[in-house]
């Protein structure tokens, strides 16, 4: 089940609130310009599926997002517990960073923890199959796929170069709960 846990930066062990209803999660995130929605991911996709297979399965949804928001690049990140670089990728995504463009993810299988650092608060969004999240450009965040990842997510970009992170150098991500905590 998707959820949103909201923490004050001074209290990483105790969330101020935990939300599990789509409408509550979406409205809380919308206050900060973050879009959260649930789309039907009817075509079964498993970690390890090729990028082409995933994109072809969701071509209609992808085209809708690209047209509506002007995205120019799409790719797929698909990881499972057998991936040879899972530890390196997890470590990289767990560093707080931001992007010069919106970060859009549509989870078509599995789950991941998208954590946003906005002012004095941290918003931990557990995204699962069918969840669509769009994080505005410049928002500090990190992503945890867990020690044993299982997810497939479609990523959309305004930048033809795809995923380009600007790391903040702050260690805040290490103080907050991880996906499997």
Curated annotation (Swiss-Prot):
Keyword annotations of the record: Amino-acid biosynthesis, Dioxygenase, Iron, Metal-binding, Methionine biosynthesis, Nickel, Oxidoreductase
Residues making up the signal peptide according to the UniProt record: none
MF (Gene Ontology): acireductone dioxygenase (Ni2+-requiring) activity; acireductone dioxygenase [iron(II)-requiring] activity; iron ion binding; nickel cation binding
Feature type site, description May play a role in metal incorporation in vivo: 96
Site positions per UniProt: Important to generate the dianion: 105
Binding-site positions, Ni(2+): 97, 99, 103, 141
Entry keyword Ubl conjugation: no
The keyword Membrane appears for this protein: no
Residues given in the record as Fe(2+) binding sites: 97, 99, 103, 141
Cofactor: Fe(2+); Ni(2+)
Domain of life: Bacteria
Cofactor: binding comment: Binds 1 Fe(2+) cation per monomer. Binds 1 nickel ion per monomer.
Site positions per UniProt: May play a role in transmitting local conformational changes: 102
Pathway(s) annotated for this protein in UniProt: Amino-acid biosynthesis; L-methionine biosynthesis via salvage pathway; L-methionine from S-methyl-5-thio-alpha-D-ribose 1-phosphate: step 5/6
Catalytic activity of the protein: 1,2-dihydroxy-5-(methylsulfanyl)pent-1-en-3-one + O2 = 3-(methylsulfanyl)propanoate + CO + formate + 2 H(+); 1,2-dihydroxy-5-(methylsulfanyl)pent-1-en-3-one + O2 = 4-methylsulfanyl-2-oxobutanoate + formate + 2 H(+)
EC nos: 1.13.11.54, 1.13.11.53
Biological-process GO terms, alphabetical: L-methionine salvage from methylthioadenosine; L-methionine salvage from S-adenosylmethionine
Function: Catalyzes 2 different reactions between oxygen and the acireductone 1,2-dihydroxy-3-keto-5-methylthiopentene (DHK-MTPene) depending upon the metal bound in the active site. Fe-containing acireductone dioxygenase (Fe-ARD) produces formate and 2-keto-4-methylthiobutyrate (KMTB), the alpha-ketoacid precursor of methionine in the methionine recycle pathway. Ni-containing acireductone dioxygenase (Ni-ARD) produces methylthiopropionate, carbon monoxide and formate, and does not lie on the methionine recycle pathway.
Family: Belongs to the acireductone dioxygenase (ARD) family.
Subunit structure: Monomer.
Protein name as annotated: Acireductone dioxygenase
Organism this protein belongs to: Pseudomonas syringae pv. tomato (strain ATCC BAA-871 / DC3000)
């Amino acid at each position: 089940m998707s959820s949103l846990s909201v923490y004050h930066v001074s209290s990483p062990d105790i969330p101020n609130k935990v939300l599990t209803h789509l409408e509550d999660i979406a409205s809380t995130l919308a206050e900060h310009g973050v879009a959260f929605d649930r789309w039907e991911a009817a075509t079964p996709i498993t970690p390890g599926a090729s990028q082409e297979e995933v994109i072809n399965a969701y071509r209609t949804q992808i085209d809708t997002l690209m047209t509506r928001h002007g995205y120019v690049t799409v790719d797929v990140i698909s990881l499972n517990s057998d991936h040879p670089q899972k530890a390196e990728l997890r470590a990289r995504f767990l560093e707080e960073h931001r992007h010069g463009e919106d970060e859009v993810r549509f989870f078509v299988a599995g789950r991941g923890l998208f954590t946003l650092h906005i002012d004095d608060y941290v918003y931990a969004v557990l995204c699962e199959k069918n969840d669509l999240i769009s994080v505005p450009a410049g928002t500090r965040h990190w992503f945890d796929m867990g020690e044993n990842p299982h997810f497939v997510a479609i990523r959309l970009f305004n930048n033809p170069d795809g995923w380009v992170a600007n790391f903040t150098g702050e260690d805040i991500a290490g103080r907050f709960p991880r996906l499997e905590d």
